[in-house]
């Protein structure tokens, strides 16, 4: 017994000396790193001009300690089929996403949710363009993308993704994940989802900040989604 105690003391000292104040978990480090990466990706567009339409990006301010954890298409599919959690599908350049994120994080903080899984759609989905009157795939989808579409099929609607050029419509013959999309999964089943943000007023564009009324409306949407998943949560714990 004395020998075991000595071994335990040695291991503790090793962790203290070579690992900082203790042996911290890899998962916590990864999530913290993900949160910082997410903050940097979104905030670096503040005050810049979007090339596609010449509009000024809406400004966001994100805390370093946020609940984001990056996942790819295959990991998202596994969560949808087998686990419980919230997945956010978005991209840093998406103006609707930039308006949605502060609201989503506020709800997560109130609900004491530590993790929101994040699928960066730029790193997952394909891109089509019309070139010389033909539909061309200019960016290939990443591994697991079509399996993800299948897993989300029930909430993606019936219509396939189409592009229009010179009055002609081109059908990709596949569904599309539109952003921002927040999906709530409970024990391997999708129980709730919300796509987009809220309706804009006549004097607003997609780059305009949300009004208080719009913020409150979106907040209630996300709050309901979280409650449908974590319905055993109280003010103190989940």
Where are these regions (language model features)?
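N-proximal helix/coil linker or "cap" segments that precede and/or mark the start of modular domains
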Residues: 28-65
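Sec-dependent N-terminal signal peptides of Gram-positive bacterial secreted proteins and lipoproteins
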Residues: 2-27
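Typically the conserved alpha-helix immediately C-terminal to a functionally engaged Cys/Sec
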Residues: 98-111
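The canonical Cys-X-X-Cys-His
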Residues: 94-98, 182
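Non-catalytic, surface beta->alpha helical segment in thiol-disulfide oxidoreductase systems
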Residues: 171-238
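A short beta-strand-turn-helix
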Residues: 65-84
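Short active-site neighborhood of thiol/selenol oxidoreductases, capturing the structured segment around
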Residues: 80-94, 104
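Thiol-based oxidoreductase modules, predominantly thioredoxin-like and allied folds used
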Residues: 70, 89, 113-163
